[in-house]
């Protein structure tokens, strides 16, 4: 059930960042950087999947996602909520429950044949579908899910995530060129601000993370393993 009043987008971002820090979803390591799927190093890593084990925080963030989508896209804008395999599935189910809408999920690879080969659940031609995922970095991985939804004859012009990196300027253009609007709760900048406010990590670590956030390509090049 969505409350009749809810925080501003700025307060949602601050609270979401605080909750992610509280459950240990945020990881900073400047001495031994993490390796991204691209193979490039990063001093920061976030694991939104941990949220499923924290019901109070999980519930609050899903309320935030539901109201963010309604605020930005409209109260009657969707007919179906689709989760991306695998991380998006539990969050799609929770958002669908709050919006009283059917839920489906999109496979990474087809199972069987036909235009619904990547869809699990009932999705009909003409339905307006919201794609839900845990996070997005550069937006590229969302396009495959969007294409699979559109192949059914449904439409998909919106995707909602808990966390948006907001450090690669091409992200919104990549999605926008594909006709997709991004909705999110918080970014690395929100997490960094809250981490500084809480002194959750050393000043040196946070300063190094900020260097990465301001110019990730340069930081990655300087810290690339040889």
Curated annotation (Swiss-Prot):
Keywords for this protein: Glycosyltransferase, Magnesium, Pyrimidine biosynthesis, Transferase
GO terms of molecular function: magnesium ion binding; orotate phosphoribosyltransferase activity
Keyword flag Glycosyltransferase: yes
Binding site for orotate: 137
Record-linked InterPro entries: OPRT, PRibTrfase_dom, PRTase-like
Annotated catalysed reactions: orotidine 5'-phosphate + diphosphate = orotate + 5-phospho-alpha-D-ribose 1-diphosphate
GO biological process, one term: 'de novo' UMP biosynthetic process
EC number(s) reported in the record: 2.4.2.10
Pathway noted in the entry: Pyrimidine metabolism; UMP biosynthesis via de novo pathway; UMP from orotate: step 1/2
Reported cofactor(s): Mg(2+)
Amino acids binding 5-phospho-alpha-D-ribose 1-diphosphate: 107-108, 111, 133-141
Gene3D superfamilies the record matches: 3.40.50.2020
Function: Catalyzes the transfer of a ribosyl phosphate group from 5-phosphoribose 1-diphosphate to orotate, leading to the formation of orotidine monophosphate (OMP).
Subunit structure: Homodimer.
UniProt similarity note: Belongs to the purine/pyrimidine phosphoribosyltransferase family. PyrE subfamily.
PANTHER family listed in its UniProt record: OROTATE PHOSPHORIBOSYLTRANSFERASE (PTHR19278), URIDINE 5'-MONOPHOSPHATE SYNTHASE (PTHR19278:SF9)
Protein name according to UniProt: Orotate phosphoribosyltransferase
